[in-house]
């Protein structure tokens, strides 16, 4: 699958939001002027149309999870067929991707790094190696680092960073054994209020 290979901080400036594409050792503000969009006229504040707002919100969420357009649209279609609120269903599907869960557990400092661990067969789900990042994790699933990868310095370093952050309440994390469990369904209040999923649903509903 194709992936974005350009400057990651440029994407954060484009969306005027920290997309957590870089390790969390330093704040995004110390790395770039996030309030200034990229380009010659990035400092200009433009009044966006309703469509432009919807498009920017979709791009922000898509880039946050590192997903290309076609796959993101497929998540929307799947979310719209589930019972309940389509916007919340979309967020749940994205949050329960294996690469995101590995990132949330702290095995990787970014979702991209978590994806690399999965591709390199360093991650198990219920004691079986899973090598595709889009794998949908279910409640009560156990996610762990395979034995041969537990000595990787980047995983150990990432876990040290994770210990300093607030732990997701929907996950249990066993640092010594490098494993965690997906405890419960993710509620809307669990996630950032900076995300406006309603704008995305409005965009796709046209």
UniProtKB/Swiss-Prot annotation:
Check the record and name the InterPro entries matching this protein.
Ribosomal_uS4 (IPR022801), Ribosomal_uS4_bac-type (IPR005709), Ribosomal_uS4_CS (IPR018079), Ribosomal_uS4_N (IPR001912), S4_RNA-bd (IPR002942), S4_RNA-bd_sf (IPR036986)
- UniProt GO BP: ribosomal small subunit biogenesis; translation
List the GO molecular function terms. Answer: rRNA binding; structural constituent of ribosome
SUPFAM superfamilies in UniProt: Alpha-L RNA-binding motif
The answer to whether UniProt assigns keyword Cytoplasm to this entry is no
PROSITE patterns for the chain: RIBOSOMAL_S4, S4
Can you quote a single GO CC term? Answer: small ribosomal subunit
Kindly indicate whether the keyword Ribonucleoprotein belongs to this entry: yes
The alphabetized UniProt keywords are: Ribonucleoprotein, Ribosomal protein, RNA-binding, rRNA-binding
Pfam families found in the cross-reference section: Ribosomal_S4, S4
Chain ranges of the S4 RNA-binding domain: 96-156
The UniProt function text for this chain reads: One of the primary rRNA binding proteins, it binds directly to 16S rRNA where it nucleates assembly of the body of the 30S subunit. With S5 and S12 plays an important role in translational accuracy.
* Self-association state and partner proteins as the record states: Part of the 30S ribosomal subunit. Contacts protein S5. The interaction surface between S4 and S5 is involved in control of translational fidelity.
Q: Which PANTHER family match?
A: 30S 40S RIBOSOMAL PROTEIN, SMALL RIBOSOMAL SUBUNIT PROTEIN US4M
Similarity comment text for this entry: Belongs to the universal ribosomal protein uS4 family.
Q: Which HAMAP family match?
A: Ribosomal_uS4_B (MF_01306_B)
The identity of this protein, by name, is: Small ribosomal subunit protein uS4
The species this protein belongs to is Buchnera aphidicola subsp. Cinara cedri (strain Cc)
As recorded in Swiss-Prot or TrEMBL, the protein's gene is named rpsD
């Amino acid at each position: 699958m194709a992936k974005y290979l350009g400057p990651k901080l440029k994407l954060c400036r484009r969306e005027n939001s920290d997309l957590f594409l870089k390790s969390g050792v330093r704040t995004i503000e110390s790395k770039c002027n996030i309030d200034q969009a990229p380009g010659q006229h990035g400092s200009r504040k433009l009044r966006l149309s309703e469509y432009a707002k919807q498009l920017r919100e979709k791009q922000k969420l898509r880039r946050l999870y590192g997903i290309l357009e076609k796959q993101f649209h497929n998540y929307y279609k799947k979310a719209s067929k589930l019972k309940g609120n389509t916007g919340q269903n979309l967020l749940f599907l994205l949050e329960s991707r294996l690469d995101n869960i590995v990132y949330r557990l702290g095995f990787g400092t970014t979702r991209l790094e978590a994806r690399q661990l999965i591709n390199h067969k360093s991650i198990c789900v219920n004691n079986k190696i899973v090598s595709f990042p889009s794998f949908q994790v279910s409640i009560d699933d156990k996610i762990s680092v395979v034995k041969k990868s537990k000595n990787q310095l980047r995983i150990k370093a990432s876990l040290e960073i994770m210990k300093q952050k607030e732990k997701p309440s929907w996950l249990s994390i066993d640092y010594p054994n490098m494993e965690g469990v997906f405890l419960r369904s993710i509620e809307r209040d669990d996630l950032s209020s900076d995300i406006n999923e309603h704008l995305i649903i409005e965009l796709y509903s046209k």
